[in-house]
């Protein structure tokens, strides 16, 4: 394992994988979120690490709060712990990862905005607020 993977396992009790950006672990009521720099079809804002905007799951067309990954993450009975890490890109090349740690999800502050999808078409996306 890399040092970051070891840190994530130590902090969360969970292993991560490189698939989707929302990794729900129901057995530990934990979600590990990944934000990737310069992803034009998402609108993540990590400029203030204490108050982050994170785009929910869905790359093409309108996002759906009932999408399995979104619905599970937003359910306070299923998910109690939320963590975030960032994939740092420079000119499209992965330069490494940054661990942001544990956050609180403000489930009452889910905002819908218009933003391009993976194909460049305007669509509705959802942004959630993560706070330290």
Pin down the residues of each PLM region.
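Acidic, glycine-rich low-complexity segments with interspersed aromatic residues
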Residues: 1-96
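Compact mixed alphabeta submodule
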Residues: 93-132
